[in-house]
């Protein structure tokens, strides 16, 4: 929750401290650029408007977090930094339109703190920047954050991939094995399969090297080539020249489980929807097609919202998938399905648990609200806020929450989460009773599910707790799959758990109050 504060922007007095002291290990120019880029990105996009002066003052409290002897305050219309009660630097506040000026001032204060404090000096440039954002984001929502350069690189790899062969390597003793291969990655297309052993890269043996080192040998600039030698599981030695490409990690794992097609989606990166579509198409093309699809979203923490919308698109007829609302025009939109139903009317059961979050909740809520799937498991995490990302000059990234998500029936996902139609977290006996009642046409979860769908933001904590207590969040269990099998095997039980479908636009547009939301989604 954003806390208000008053900032005096009155006096135009020459600064008492005009030039930051150059200190080894601290780069004031980089810090200025990072702050300026971040503040310019945040000011028009935060969920609630916050002036740049307030954002900067919050961030400067990071100096106190590093060294409690450093205090930032406002006195006589001037912003001051003190140590042990002694003035270190003071400046007149600036106009809230001067974002670059506030960034430069914050950098000057940081440089003065570095010169005055051994603790801050030891933290260095990265420590000062990290502390600035840590303190700033303490005043915003739980999901807005700064990601340092080292972690940002890993985050980007998860979202968009890295240039390589699309292979995940593992070490078994002295052997480097392929743990998994992205199905449409260059390695898999060259014939490399899980379980094969990598033996050479560009003619150099990998003997004595670990999996990470071998992965680094395979990686390189996009559209360059690497020669990979490997030994297949049946002992044949093969070699191929592979062109490196950007390959996101695999997120979709499909297998036949009796009469069901079980599809696990671990997160949503830029290839998830395409891989999910292929998995469903291949599963349905089997000479003995499955009786139903089980979409396993347990433990899925989310990812790219557009990918979740595209995943919903392949299972839903035309209509609303989700509604997002924010201050930036690009943040407010109605996300729609349009492509048609890839799986026809085949039953769909969606497995969720207390770790299912964000984009995964959007997909689960859409399938449930539109009467296309039965959600089974426990209450999900309840992360109904969407972040937009900006790269920063230090190589880090800024994640800013810029919109709230509403499900197709108009209820907010944030805080509530998705309440399943079949609750598996109340124990095995309760689950058996629910399935038996559904088989007789009675839906024991209907009152709670209906109550959730009727809620509108903002919500009181008591409302949230009352809904979530109907099916407390928990980790998924093996019995979830057996319950899904029971739903798919008995059409009457499955039908009793379904919500009635939203049949036309009028049933969803009533939840939208802002004209800016009535627009088709645009690509990022």
What are these regions (language model features)?
Residues 40-45, 113, 187-210, 293-296:
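Conserved PDZ fold ligand-binding element
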Residues 131-133, 138-180:
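PDZ/PDZ-like peptide-tail recognition elements
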Residues 186-197, 219-221, 288, 366:
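A short glycine-leucine-enriched loop at secondary-structure breakpoints
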């Amino acid at each position: 929750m954003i806390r208000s504060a008053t900032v005096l922007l009155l006096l135009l007095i020459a600064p008492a401290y005009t030039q930051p002291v150059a200190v080894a290990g601290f780069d004031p120019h980089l810090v200025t650029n990072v702050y300026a880029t971040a503040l310019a990105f945040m000011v028009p996009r935060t969920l609630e408007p916050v002036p740049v002066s307030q954002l900067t003052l919050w961030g400067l409290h990071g100096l106190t977090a590093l060294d409690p002897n450093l205090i930032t305050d406002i006195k006589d219309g001037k912003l001051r930094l003190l140590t042990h009660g002694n003035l270190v630097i003071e400046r007149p506040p600036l106009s809230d339109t001067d974002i670059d000026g506030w960034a430069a001032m914050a950098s000057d204060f940081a440089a003065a703190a570095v010169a005055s404090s051994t603790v801050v000096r030891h933290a260095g440039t990265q420590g000062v920047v990290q502390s600035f954002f840590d303190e700033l984001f303490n005043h915003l929502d739980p999901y807005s954050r700064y990601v340092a350069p080292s972690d940002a690189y890993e985050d980007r790899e998860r979202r968009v991939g890295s240039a390589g062969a699309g292979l995940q390597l593992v070490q078994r003793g002295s052997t480097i094995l392929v743990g998994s291969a992205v199905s449409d990655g260059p390695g898999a297309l060259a014939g490399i399969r899980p379980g094969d052993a990598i033996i050479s890269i560009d003619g150099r043996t990998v003997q004595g090297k670990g999996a990470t080192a071998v992965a680094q040998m395979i990686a390189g600039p996009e559209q360059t080539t690497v020669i990979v030698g490997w030994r297949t599981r049946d002992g044949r030695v093969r070699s191929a020249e592979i062109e490196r490409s950007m390959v996101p990690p695999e997120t979709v794992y499909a297998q036949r489980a009796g009469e069901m097609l079980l599809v696990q989606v671990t997160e949503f990166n830029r290839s998830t929807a395409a891989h999910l579509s292929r998995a469903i198409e291949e599963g349905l093309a089997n000479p003995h097609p499955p009786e139903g699809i089980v979409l396993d979203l347990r433990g899925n923490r989310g990812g790219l919202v557009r990918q979740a919308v595209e995943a919903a698109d392949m299972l839903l007829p035309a209509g609303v998938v989700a509604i997002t609302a924010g201050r930036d025009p690009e943040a407010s939109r109605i996300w729609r399905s349009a492509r048609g139903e890839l799986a026809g009317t085949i039953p769909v059961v969606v497995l969720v648990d207390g770790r299912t979050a964000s984009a995964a909740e959007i997909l689960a809520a859409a399938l449930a609200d539109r009467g296309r799937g039965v959600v089974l498991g426990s209450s999900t995490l309840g992360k109904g806020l969407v972040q937009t990302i900006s790269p920063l000059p230090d190589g880090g990234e800024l994640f800013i929450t810029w919109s709230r998500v509403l499900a197709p029936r108009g209820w907010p996902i944030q805080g509530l989460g998705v309440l399943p139609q079949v609750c598996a977290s109340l124990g095995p006996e309760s689950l058996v009773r629910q399935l038996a009642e559904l088989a007789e046409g009675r839906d024991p979860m209907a009152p709670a599910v209906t109550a959730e769908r009727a809620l509108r933001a903002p919500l009181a904590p008591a409302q949230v707790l009352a809904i979530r207590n109907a099916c407390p969040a928990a980790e998924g269990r093996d019995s979830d799959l057996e319950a899904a099998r029971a739903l798919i095997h008995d059409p009457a039980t499955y039908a009793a758990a379904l919500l009635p479908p939203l049949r036309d636009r009028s049933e969803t547009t009533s939840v939208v109050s802002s004209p800016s939301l009535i627009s088709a989604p645009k690509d990022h």
